[in-house]
Structures are given as structure tokens and as C-alpha cells.
């Protein structure tokens, strides 16, 4: 389990501000959190070193780059029965890392083993991914799909 980093109120204000605009200058950030720019810089560097801030990215709406269909796939894997066979979970995890359509993969408790978030151009692209990639993988036993009709809430910010 990861070590829990102690954050004070100023750290939390810095994190909230950077989650809303990761490109703001240290001067602007310092003004927002009521610190000097040098003190703000020190805190941000510490948060980066402690991996509280894991990185900075550009957020790209999939629809703006031709990926208009989002699906959530519940995937069930076969249960391995032979001792010499490689674990189906290991095989599946390695494969998922190579599939560009999969933008998120979570291991689950319950009836299904994994939940995938997949972004594709359209239903034809989805069908190719399912038929030619996912269902042909030797560890996949079953999958069930739900398509996104509307995103009611979509944020990358965590409540700090």
C-alpha cells in the first residue's frame, strides 16, 4: 500500500489550483494560494518528488480527434487449470497495455474480472476491436458492453 503523504491546507489549495489549470505560472499560483512564488515553487517540487503530483498532461476530448464512441466493457477471464500455463490475468494485463483503444483498465471484485473503458471511432471500429482483438485473446472468456450515451460528469480532478 502506498504511503499516505501529509498535506496541509496550502498543499491542498495548490493541488486544487493545478488540477483546474496545470499550466499556470508559479506567480499566478502563488497569488491564488497566498504564498510567495519561491515558497510555492518549493511546495510544488516537494509534491512532485513525493509523487502526489504524478505529471502534467493535455486533456483531449476523444470526440475532437474522431473517437466518438465510448464503451465500458466488463471482461471475465478464463480460470487457469494447468499449473504450467501462464496465469490468464498476467496474459490479459500484458495485452491490454498494447491495445490503444483501451484508455482505462481496472481489476474488479465480483462477477467480472476487469472493467475497460474503450474509445473508438464508431461502431465498425468497436466491432473490429471486439472481434479481432479482445475476443480472440486466449484468456478472455466473456465480455459485456455498455455504451456511453451522455457524459453527465467527466473530471480528472480528485477531491483534495
Predicted regions and their residues:
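A compositional/biophysical signature of low hydrophobicity enriched in polar/charged and small residues
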Residues: 1-160
Amino acid at each position: 500500500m502506498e504511503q499516505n503523504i501529509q498535506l496541509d491546507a496550502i498543499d491542498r489549495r495548490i493541488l486544487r489550483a493545478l488540477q483546474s489549470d496545470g499550466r499556470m505560472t508559479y506567480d499566478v499560483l502563488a497569488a491564488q494560494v497566498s504564498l510567495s512564488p519561491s515558497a510555492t515553487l518549493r511546495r510544488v517540487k516537494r509534491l512532485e518528488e513525493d509523487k502526489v503530483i504524478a505529471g502534467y498532461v493535455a486533456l483531449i476530448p476523444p470526440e475532437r480527434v474522431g473517437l466518438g464512441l465510448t464503451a465500458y466493457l466488463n471482461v471475465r477471464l478464463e480460470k487457469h487449470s494447468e499449473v504450467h500455463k501462464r496465469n490468464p490475468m498476467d496474459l490479459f494485463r500484458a495485452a491490454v497495455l498494447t491495445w490503444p483503444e483501451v484508455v482505462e483498465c481496472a481489476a474488479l471484485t465480483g462477477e467480472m474480472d476487469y472493467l475497460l473503458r474503450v474509445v473508438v471511432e464508431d461502431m465498425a471500429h468497436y466491432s473490429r476491436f471486439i472481434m479481432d482483438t479482445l475476443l480472440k485473446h486466449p484468456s478472455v472468456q466473456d465480455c459485456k458492453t455498455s455504451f456511453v450515451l451522455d457524459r453527465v460528469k467527466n473530471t480528472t480532478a480528485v477531491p483534495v
